[in-house]
Amino acid sequence: RGFAIKACLPYSYGPGMPGPYIAIIYNALCDSAQGVAFSPAIGYNVPCINVQRGIAMSCDLLVGSTGFVGGNLLAKHTFAAACHSSDITAQYGTCPDLCVYAGVPAAMFLANADPEADLAVMRAARENIRQIAPKRLVLISSIAVLADSRGIYEDSPAQDTEALPAYGKNRLQLERWVREDFPDALIVRLPALYGAGLRKNFLFDLHTITPAMLKPEKYSELAAKSPLVKSAYTLADNGFYKLNGTADPAALRAFFAANDFNALAFTDARSRYQFYNLGRLWSDMEAARAADVKLLHLCTPPVSAAEIYTAVTGKADWHNELPKPPFDYDLRSRHAALLGGSDDYLCTKQQELDDITRFMRSWRD
């Protein structure tokens, strides 16, 4: 009942380490086998390929497994392997059939504060992908690579990048490197997101109401009103007062819900966003890959912050206008119909608001 197959694949396992990549596939006592690969250059076993009844099965890898996007992908699909920044080198040379790279940091503030350091992170991402050497690649990117998303499709002419902040410019550079290295890769541009583990954006602020950070003058004002606020925030290295986790979240929420100032003060009610539910990301990517799509905009219709507030709370009493022009996102897709949508979007505006409302009302801390 047992069998063994040896396969030699020519491959340079890591920089300057030429050598055979040996796979021994075995099945001793059962109807399925787990393949392992051994590299003389590295000296340990790494996952290679699954065999069931003698038939090779697809092997896939998720990079960024501990992140917001990665966590939601793991909830929808069982990957053969998953890793993050601290253990990614263990996946070098594994050559998976598919690599979903969701490991690019989404810290916009840090990227714009230190553009060169952020670009170095993009270079590292490129090298990670090269060293993993997948047969097929999906890169999770962002709408932020566009200076103006209004009316922009996947096949729209390239925009001038001079107006792009470092966050968007550097991620656009990574897209270009990936296209150079992997011409058949699927690049997915995501707009504003929601799903399990959400920790930022307007939906998070609407749920928590409690500001994550306060300017010193605002902290002093609120701390004078409330001992709860005074003890709940600590001065951070960036000069802002940051939540320290010591106060009861429900008590803080009650205080800020009754206060003129809360987390909603940071959003212009007129701003329009496109909110995408990460629960559908895996199925949308699979449909796009099956259709051999190379660039995909996962875009829902633009909805204003005020419209979301009213849909979720049932009230129309929130009006907030900031000095700067409001955000206005309106990304379009040529592939909306492929994913069950129409008219350039994945769903209707009402469907989007209904889904956001369901998500917000089912949210548990």
Model regions and ranges:
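Short, low-complexity intrinsically disordered segments enriched in A/P/G/S/L with frequent Arg
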Residues: 9, 19, 37-40
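NAD(P)H-binding glycine-rich loop region in Rossmannoid oxidoreductase-like domains
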Residues: 15, 89-135, 139-154
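N-terminal Rossmann NAD(P)H-binding glycine-rich loop of SDR-like oxidoreductase domains
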Residues: 60-77
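A short beta-strand-loop structural module common to alpha/beta enzyme folds
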Residues: 79-92
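Short-chain dehydrogenase/reductase
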Residues: 115, 119, 156, 160-172, ...
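Active-site Tyr-X1-5-Lys
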Residues: 164-186, 191, 227
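NAD(P)-dependent short-chain dehydrogenase/reductase
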Residues: 184-274, 280
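Mid/C-terminal beta-alpha module of Rossmann-like enzyme folds, strongest
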Residues: 268, 276-335, 350-365
